[in-house]
């Protein structure tokens, strides 16, 4: 009987020590989503010039409501997304709110990941912005985006940042506030959409630029949050979620890193 009990205990211990592998970060659903955004980008291209010309007509450019809305949501995307992500992280550290810290850190990571991908693509594509020549949405030249901001049109950095934040915050809501995820998603994605549309209004991007940017940002947010939550022992979380931020005696804040396992 003792031998049997020992065998059961040994088997239980071995089972406990054999952790189940984490689920895949990139799923079939993500593949379909990526393909959908690529298709949407291609479908948007025939309408690039038409929308650009419509947006620049006096009726739209002199509309105070459209102009003010575009300004607000353009700034919400840049620098707003960085301020929001970083602000949530710092506020979470100061108030010792793990959830707020988590959301701020992971949304900031998503913005960085999307921005890096966007920089690589726009630098290589070298697409001219509509303000360069509104009659030529097909003006691409490999590598030209490295030389001038006028040729960094494809994809939109504002759109990808706004959608990365929206996607990450919505994904985090599924872990922390599942009953409010739909509402949070509607608000954040709604704001991201208006941020994206501000770019054609400002004659800075074509329609297809913002569609691709939205796709990159959305995927970045989903993948970053999923990876972080299925790999909780990753070095980013160990370092930055273990960091403490507190008011310094002489003013300002004191920062200390406490890497955890």
Spans of model-derived segments:
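Flexible, solvent-exposed coil segments and beta strand-coil junctions
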Residues: 17, 61-65
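Short, glycine/alanine-rich hydrophobic alpha-helices that insert into or span membranes
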Residues: 34-43, 85
């Amino acid at each position: 009987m003792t031998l049997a009990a020992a065998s059961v205990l040994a088997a239980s211990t071995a089972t406990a020590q054999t952790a189940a592998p984490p689920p895949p970060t990139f799923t079939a659903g993500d593949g379909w989503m990526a393909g959908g955004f690529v298709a949407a980008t291609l479908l948007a291209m025939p309408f690039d010039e038409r929308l650009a010309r419509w947006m620049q007509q006096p009726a739209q450019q002199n509309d105070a409501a459209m102009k003010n809305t575009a300004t607000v949501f353009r700034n919400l995307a840049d620098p707003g997304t960085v301020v929001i992500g970083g602000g949530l992280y710092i506020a979470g550290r100061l108030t010792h709110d793990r959830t707020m810290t988590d959301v701020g850190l992971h949304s900031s990571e998503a913005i960085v990941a999307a921005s890096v991908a966007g920089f690589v693509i726009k630098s290589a594509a070298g697409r001219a912005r509509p303000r360069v020549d509104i009659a030529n949405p097909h003006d691409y030249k490999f590598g030209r985006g490295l030389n001038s901001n006028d040729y960094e049109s494809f994809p939109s950095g504002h759109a990808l940042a706004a959608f990365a934040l929206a996607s990450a915050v919505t994904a985090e809501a599924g872990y922390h506030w599942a009953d409010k995820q739909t509402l949070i998603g509607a608000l954040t994605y709604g704001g991201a959409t208006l941020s994206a549309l501000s770019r054609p209004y400002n004659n800075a991007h074509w329609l297809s630029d913002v569609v691709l940017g939205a796709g990159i940002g959305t995927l970045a947010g989903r993948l970053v949050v999923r990876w972080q939550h299925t790999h909780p022992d990753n070095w980013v979380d160990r370092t930055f979620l273990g960091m403490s931020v507190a008011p310094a005696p002489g003013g300002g804040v004191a920062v200390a890193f406490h890497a955890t396992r």
